[in-house]
Amino acid sequence: MESFASLAGGGSSSTTARLPELISPENPDHISPPPLLYQLLAGPESSARQHGHDGHHHGGGGGEAAAAAVQGQVSPAGAEAAVKAEIMSHPQYSALLAAYLGCKKVGAPPDVLTKLTAVPAAQQLDEADGHPRRRHEPQRDDDPDQLDQFMDAYCSMLTRYREELERPILEAAEFFSRVETQLDSLAESNCEGTGSSEEEQDPSDKQLKHQLLRKYGGSLGDLRQVFSKRTKKGKLPKEARQKLLHWWELHYKWPYPSEMEKMTLAQTTGLDQKQINNWFINQRKRHWKPTPVAGTAFPTMEAAGGGFRHSGHGGGLAAAAALPLYMGRPFVVDGMYRLGS
């Protein structure tokens, strides 16, 4: 058959796209020659075959064909032009053209898609120039509703054909969309827990961070100071231990600080009195062992305000008075303080 594009373009020969041949509605109960509309749209070969078939049944029909020509019957070429004119002037021609162009747009490249989109605009301009699409009364002896049935049938056929063409494309697009979603979820799960740099932060996040720092900066500083004072595994800060050791070296003969000295050490080291007391107790137990003279009782004192505990039979007060005489200067062994003569 001739392509429907020739109808869309007013019979232009530049369009080469073709659709399947037009098939008349199925009627298995009554077999008759196809109507003139379907014969003409099926192509000149079909029309010629039909006319030859009619001529064969009429006994060659040479004289009758001449008589028909004399009587003014329309030739096949003239009938085809008349059918095209009726189709293009039918009210549903725009819908038929849109359905056909919809089939051509499926999977078309961008340049072809642009050209196909411009076709309805050209048809509207044609109508604005004085060629409106209006219904012509049939000038033939065919059924008046035949053209309406033809337009409805082929609009529905082209719509179904376009849906069949779009189905694999839509399925492929849905498949790729699912794959993309899965890849995005995998990428997001791999990136969880990784911190972003200052340059990658959102401006709103930076502004919120600055506001929180201005509001809670003082409290954060206090918390940082408190956490810095906390010791790990009972170890005091290095600076505090150095200050305590300096006091220890200065008072190695009697390493028992008074309450006032403890308060002063607490202020200078940043420790509390409990930590200072514990440090001096451990330091005296580990590194302060005065050597007693043979035959002389030596008292020991467990705390600054504690009483004396005597060993031997000597006088405790006399031994306590002579206590500094048995203490020499300290010396270091393996980093630990020792007292000797």
Curated annotation (Swiss-Prot):
Gene3D superfamilies given in the database record: Homeodomain-like
Bias class Low complexity marks the residues at 1-17
Region listing for Disordered, in residue ranges: 1-72, 121-148, 187-207
- CDD domains from the entry? homeodomain
What SUPFAM superfamilies does the database record attribute to this sequence? Homeodomain-like (SSF46689)
Q: Which GO terms describe its cellular component?
A: nucleus
InterPro entries in the record, alphabetically?
ELK_dom, HD, Homeobox_CS, Homeodomain-like_sf, KN_HD, KNOX1, KNOX2, TALE_homeobox
Domain ELK, residue spans: 207-227
Q: Taking the first listed entry, what is the main subcellular location of this protein, grouped into a coarse class?
A: nucleus
Q: Which family does it belong to?
A: Belongs to the TALE/KNOX homeobox family.
Name by which UniProt lists this protein: Homeobox protein knotted-1-like 8
* Source organism (scientific name): Oryza sativa subsp. japonica
